[in-house]
Curated annotation (Swiss-Prot):
UniProt KW Isomerase keyword: yes
Entry similarity comment: Belongs to the class-III pyridoxal-phosphate-dependent aminotransferase family. HemL subfamily.
Protein name: Glutamate-1-semialdehyde 2,1-aminomutase
Domain of life: Bacteria
Residue numbers carrying N6-(pyridoxal phosphate)lysine: 265
Classification via PANTHER family: GLUTAMATE-1-SEMIALDEHYDE 2,1-AMINOMUTASE, GLUTAMATE-1-SEMIALDEHYDE 2,1-AMINOMUTASE 1, CHLOROPLASTIC-RELATED
Source species of the chain: Shigella dysenteriae serotype 1 (strain Sd197)
Gene it is expressed from: hemL
Lineage, uppermost ranks: Bacteria, Pseudomonadati, Pseudomonadota, Gammaproteobacteria, Enterobacterales
Length: 426
């Protein structure tokens, strides 16, 4: 047995399914998950000594690559001063100044410890501010594992929420309306059915949890208009897209102004950080100034703030996002060319430093139904064959891939060459 296999066997005796987050178990592709010993730049190294070109990037945070010296040094320096104080620090102020400077729609920001905390808190704030209970989310979009968000859609354009996980009471889910991503008609139908009850829309501006599905041109502006028409708040969940699709996020890339923004992943530079913020009048409703309660023992802790501050300063440097776009575009185009040569039907969506690979005969993939129609079994084989080639993709047909500026054009070309060999056997 390999070291990964031995560790996985031991882990399953102690940790549910052997992992601390479900997708890591390789359930979506089968086989034994890799146990990682270290990472540097664009590469992961497993406990068996194998190296992989990494397109998971810790599920998004590693936009600068692994083990970036500026972030590593910032963490070391902060740790020497103490790990957590439970009191305000100068770095929290500097971090808030930087975030609100980089994302101009955020007049104020509050730090939390994860993307789930950010979305959960933003929704509570929207409900408290508007005095309304219902929310709209989209089929196939993921906003963390808060009870009200673990909801799936049934048939039809408008579906009253049904729990997607045991342990979520139906009474919690009934206030969550699920609409179809990239379908404004389904959203209008929800508002017309509940014109005075919907507090907010929460949306991934690029859906990254049904692989990578960008918005149609009219979708995000249409959501803004509907929120304005019916008095609801628009929450853009930039946990995945923030500082990756563009410096000011997908909201800037697509030209839409939210009321609240949720951030995570890159904002922590690899440490557990989330944030939510937006309009000053809305944020003023948070405790202790306002009545909407939110708190966290480790929120804004000095280690995480130091890592995030160092990361964002690097991400804000000229040329970072142009490089991300260039590398991602080259990978997408190369994969499509290699698939066409082998007669493999393929769609590759990409925007900024995100991409998604779909095995499908369709000309495009724009919604959850399109994603579900793709050939998942072929993806599973593709994943394992690419792994054998030393390329680590997301171990699920429903997760986006992530580029970093640490990837070289040689890495990209080697990945395309590996895919060409795999497609020939697929």
């Amino acid at each position: 047995m390999s070291k990964s296999e031995n560790l996985y066997s031991a882990a399953r005796e102690l940790i549910p399914s052997g992992v601390n987050s479900p997708v890591r178990a390789f359930t979506g592709v089968g086989g034994t998950p890799l146990f990682i010993e270290k990472a540097d730049g664009a590469y992961l190294y497993d406990v068996d000594g194998k190296a992989y070109i990494d397109y998971v990037g810790s599920w998004g945070p590693m936009v600068l690559g692994h083990n970036h010296p500026a972030i590593r040094n910032a963490v070391i320096e902060a740790a020497e001063r103490g790990l957590s104080f439970g009191a305000p620090t100068e770095m929290e102020v500097k971090m808030a100044q930087l975030v609100t400077e980089l994302v101009p729609t955020m007049d104020m920001v509050r730090m939390v410890n994860s993307g789930t905390e950010a979305t959960m808190s933003a929704i509570r704030l929207a409900r408290g501010f508007t005095g309304r209970d219902k929310i709209i989310k989209f089929e196939g979009c993921y906003h963390g594992h808060a009870d009200c968000l673990l909801v799936k859609a049934g048939s039809g354009a408008l579906t009253l929420g049904q729990p997607n996980s045991p342990g979520v009471p139906a009474d919690f889910a009934k206030h969550t309306l699920t609409c179809t991503y990239n379908d404004l008609a389904s959203v209008r139908a929800a508002f017309e059915q509940y014109p005075q009850e919907i507090a907010c829309i929460i949306v991934e501006p690029v859906a990254g949890n049904m692989n990578c599905v960008p918005p149609l041109p009219e979708f995000l502006p249409g959501l803004r208009a509907l929120c304005d028409e019916f008095g609801a708040l628009l929450i853009i969940d930039e946990v995945m897209t923030g500082f990756r699709v563009a410096l000011a996020g997908a909201q800037d890339y697509y030209g839409v102004v939210p009321d609240l923004t949720c951030l995570g992943k890159i904002i922590g530079g690899g440490m557990p950080v989330g944030a939510f913020g937006g309009r000053r009048d809305v944020m003023d409703a948070l405790a202790p100034t306002g009545p909407v309660y939110q708190a966290g023992t480790l929120s804004g802790n000095p280690i995480a703030m130091a890592a995030g501050f160092a990361c964002l300063n690097e991400v804000a440097q000229p040329g970072v996002h142009e490089t991300l776009h260039e590398l991602t575009t080259r990978l997408a185009e190369g994969l499509l060319e290699a698939a066409e040569e082998a007669g493999i039907p393929l769609v590759v969506n990409h925007v900024g430093g995100m991409f998604g690979i779909f095995f499908t005969d369709a000309e495009s993939v724009t919604c959850y139904q399109d994603v579900m129609a793709c050939d998942v079994e072929r993806f599973k084989r593709f994943f394992h064959m690419m792994l054998d080639e030393g390329v680590y993709l997301a171990p699920s047909a429903f997760e986006a891939g992530f580029m970093s500026v640490a990837h070289s054009m040689e890495d990209i070309n080697n990945t395309i060459d590996a895919a060409r060999r795999v497609f020939a056997k697929l």
